[in-house]
Swiss-Prot record:
Top-level class of the enzyme under EC nomenclature: transferase
InterPro entries in UniProt: Methyltransf_25, SAM-dependent_MTases_sf
PANTHER family: JUVENILE HORMONE ACID O-METHYLTRANSFERASE, METHYLTRANSFERASE
Keyword annotations of the record: Methyltransferase, Transferase
Name of the protein in question: Uncharacterized methyltransferase C750.03c
Amino acid sequence: MNLLQLGKLHENVLDAGCEPNRNARYLASLGYKVVGIDISERAISKAIDKTSSEKSNVNFNQRDFSRLNEFKGHFDTVIDIGCFHSILNSDHEPYTASLSHICHSDSSVFLRAFSETNKSRYRRWQGHKRYSLALKRNNVKKLSL
């Protein structure tokens, strides 16, 4: 994971769209406090089953991505690997608005989504621009695409 090598991850991590939960479990094994969320009940059940025999610092929650403001406290790091471009376009703004509630001024949000470089393969490549603009409108200051 390059973010680790670059020292970009900080103590409290949210893994948005955590299936198949490898990142959440790996970061927890390194001592990070991790919350993995997914809208899929099946994905969360599988994640809980996988970690039930492990001693880890990860908590999995089924969660509507537009209701992250229900979390108490803030996250230092948010990792979104495939969540944003998997939700409906109409949910992009509520999702990014909810991120602003769980991020503090020094939080970092890392997004892996479709980009201009692969637009011939994917029709929704413009999503990264909407995400970036929505995050900025909602006062999330640090964004890496």
